[in-house]
């Protein structure tokens, strides 16, 4: 395994040899095959949803500068998308605002980001602060919660050629479609911000769904293949209990750099801290 790991960067170089970066239009055309490959062969593509979204909302926050709602959208008959939508007050009729879709880390809830009564040491209510600044914000629930419960879902999906992100991608697609229908939303300015495990979403989902206008990966961007498979690297997932990380032949096709190439030419940003524990400083 370690010998294959050392050769992976050269396999990726051969794999990407048909991408042409001579200009933006050529790049877009020649990387479509890689976006399709990532979705079909690495993440695993679920059929497009056929059910109506049937949006349901419930008022949960009344703040001085914004109002908050719990939102539920149907994706499949037994799969739904859930999150908290914060809408700034004072939006004039006909005015449209940009949106930030936000994602927390492992074992989190949207309330960890949006509830002003919770001051999580990693998040510090940043979703509420964005709403106070005038952004529409959607903090969504991801299925990586429940310790081994969600990891069992991953292992059940893998023999079918699927992964947890197969469902996450379709949930995001449904959320983007619904957000674009809201009269106060500027649908071509929906951005994504993910932190920690949420940044695994920031790498994969905007690479596949071009409706996101930009992506920010916070506290996760890495030499991802080594981090997953190295037997010697002190930050390797081989030394943790997060055994669900591995993806289909990822090392020979996509590292985090290559995923970010699929976001290009849309803006992409990396945030990291000197002491965030992601990689050696």
Model segments located where?
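Non-catalytic accessory segments flanking enzyme active sites
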Residues: 7-87
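Mobile cap/lid helix-loop segments that gate and shape the active-site cleft of serine hydrolases
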Residues: 167, 214-259, 274-281
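Conserved hydrolase catalytic core segment
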Residues: 207-213
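Active-site glycine-rich loops that stabilize anionic/oxyanionic intermediates
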Residues: 76-77, 104-109, 196
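Cap/lid segment of the alpha/beta-hydrolase catalytic domain
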Residues: 92-181, 226-231
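Short beta-strand/loop motif that positions the catalytic acidic residue
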Residues: 263, 270-272
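Glycine-rich nucleophile elbow surrounding the catalytic serine of serine-hydrolase chemistry
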Residues: 194-206
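Alpha/beta-hydrolase fold nucleophile elbow
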Residues: 184-196
